Amino acid sequence: MSAGPITLKPLEDSQEAAWDAYVLANPRATFFHRAPWRRVIERAFGHRAHFLLAEQGGRVLGVLPMFHVKSLLFGSALVSTAYGVYGGPVADNAEVLALFHERAEAMARELGVDHVEFRAAEGERPGWKRKEGLYATFRREIGPDNEKNLLAIPRKQRAVVRQSLEKGLVGRVDDDIDLNYDMYALSVRNHGTPVFARSFFHALKKEFGQDCEILNIHKDAEAVAGCLTFYFRDEILPYYAGGTPRAREFGAHDFMYWDLIRRGADRGCRVF
């Protein structure tokens, strides 16, 4: 008996659990394919979400998260996933993948966008352009033994970590998003980069809960660095980080990334 036709339809609130269950189970999916991104980006930036769910006989066969991003600087585009480092369609087979590409191209024509951008490592569409050398991915494996994890850090950075421990730096996981945001905003502004709205950080924490962690680094009572980090399966994803002018004095950034590795290993993570 046939399972019926494959259908592509917009994601509804009632289907979010099924969407995320598929994302967690598919090894090609990433944190940036998760369903809550549609609310985060729509509320924080106003970009309309177009999340497509592929089904056959009630079974999820694939997902494609997209946003219609309108910008005076970059024009109009369908992006998967906006404000994320990964995205694009994730599907069980080539047939579903082709349907996603066809629907994205049709939506691009309907919306009149300048281009479609899939931030995907695989699943290229014939005829689409691939941008080489634009992005870089940094990943390393970590193990359950934190002494070995420390020894795996390059010698110079490892020395800074040990010195920061001697200086009394302490990492604290808490819900002080505003403190974390202030350090991020200060660092980004000092580099001449536009600063995201505070509401974006609050939306991330609200939507992703325990999978979005706030780590602030303190020297005594003073916060000197911080990082907003995502957790996905066995992976740690440090995403937005910053520090005060005194961070370098204490080696706070090196300590912060070591503390993230240590905490992630204790949590069962194996990729940093």
Q: In which residue ranges do the predicted regions lie?
A:
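N-terminal, well-ordered alpha-helical segments
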Residues: 50-52, 62, 87, 102
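A conserved beta-strand-loop-helix scaffold within acyl/acetyltransferase catalytic domains
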Residues: 4-57, 64-74, 120-249
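Acyl-donor binding region in acyl/amide transferases
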Residues: 67-133, 233-272
